[in-house]
Amino acid sequence: MTETKTLKNFIGGQWVASTSGKEEIVPNPATGEVLAKVPISSREELDAAVAAAKEAFREWRKVPVPRRARILFRYQQLLVEHWEELARLVTLENGKVYEDAYGEVQRGIECVEFAAGIPTLMMGQQLPDIATGIESGMYRYPLGVVAGITPFNFPMMVPCWMFPLAIACGNTFVLKPSERTPLLANRLAELFTEAGLPAGVLNIVHGAHEVVNGILEHKDIKAVSFVGSQPVAEYVYKTAAAYGKRVQALAGAKNHSIVMPDADLDMAVTNIINAAFGSAGERCMACSVVVAVGDIADELVERLKKAADRIQIGNGLDQGVFLGPVIRESHKERTIKYIEIGEREGALLVRDGRRDAATSGKGYFVGPTIFDHVKPGMTIWTDEIFAPVLSVVRARDLDEAIEIANRSEFANGACIYTDSAKAIRQFREEIDAGMLGVNVAVPAPMAFFPFSGYKNSFYGDLHANGRDGVEFYTRKKMVTARH
């Protein structure tokens, strides 16, 4: 029997075995097969990574911006060359189907492409005549050592939101990837090194709470980016801010899709099925609530059930599979408890994902689950379940639909299905969410726009990606000169 390998940390350009003596297994969620072991590193190992990043910053900050951009361009090329390998790795450790994983790799590559445009993005501003013989200008500079804490559900895309842009801006980076999906992070570091990134500019420390708290409290880390659940995001924001750090913490969601009576139901059903059950519902832009407006509700629910019945469940590497497993057995059990709560609180269980054949075999499978006649305030409406569970709420009109969506504590995304320009305008103006979709499945923006949730979906001032990302990873100097 082949011995399961234990992953290493990446510190100062070297792969370093952890000395903590603690580790966890990394199973394939579709089969339970152990892929690797991941170290649960110590605070001392984090300190070593920060020290390496701090030392590397002394020279990296001086590297001309066009030269940094060329390294990013080479990195982008390597990611494209290894696209299929990276997608397969995402499926193996995360469980999402290969098609979803392939798309995730594309989004990660797009983030690197955006970061490679750093010469334009880093430009400052200048006014030559603020007074007679006096000019003034604003210049951007890197912060220093910055850190990222990333989740299991997008092991390629979310790290690529963070470290390529931060490094392009002249910072050095310490990444703490999810201990559930650590394999992809290490591969990203290998390819960045191959692209010519100097030692110490990117460091990876695997771990859990001790490493997270070390990042939040470390005096030499100037900024922290986080993506994860709402309670942890709030903790990260409050703790890091208390230590004087710049923070962006992207949190949970409960995204509503409003279906109007004039909607194209074929398109709406296809999009909702993709948004609700794609990636097993484990994404912060998943559609978890449908608000059916008027007399369209019965037909919509019937069509959603029929479409869900046709979904093939299984290993994400198998041909034709649409729905893979959730990330862990504990998450499967948590999802089943939410289904039980929904029944107990009086929602109508239209499709029970617990009964799908795949749920009784190996792997952590839950089939597509649909509730109808869900009321705002029910637990399955309120909580982020983060699984293939869809709630249908009924509303009399658009006013009530928007009021229902706006009652959620979260404000990541929302969609509307309609051809009415009036309804679209009202939705755009009145809905309380950061990323809006009109007749689209998932309104997640591309890398050159900010990922802009708010309320309890976001803690901080500057969002990930786009100009917000550049602002987050740089500081400004104003220079006023007399000639």
Swiss-Prot record:
Subunit structure: Homotetramer.
Provenance organism: Geobacillus thermodenitrificans (strain NG80-2)
Gene assigned in the entry: iolA2
Record's protein name: Malonate-semialdehyde dehydrogenase 2
Family, similarity comment: Belongs to the aldehyde dehydrogenase family. IolA subfamily.
Pathway annotation from the record: Polyol metabolism; myo-inositol degradation into acetyl-CoA; acetyl-CoA from myo-inositol: step 7/7
GO MF entries: malonate-semialdehyde dehydrogenase (acetylating) activity; methylmalonate-semialdehyde dehydrogenase (acylating, NAD) activity
Keywords, alphabetical: NAD, Oxidoreductase
Broad EC category: oxidoreductase
Residues of the active site: 284 (nucleophile)
Binding site for NAD(+): 152, 176, 179-180, 229, 384
Organism domain of life: Bacteria
E.C. code: 1.2.1.27
Catalytic activity: 3-oxopropanoate + NAD(+) + CoA + H2O = hydrogencarbonate + acetyl-CoA + NADH + H(+); 2-methyl-3-oxopropanoate + NAD(+) + CoA + H2O = propanoyl-CoA + hydrogencarbonate + NADH + H(+)
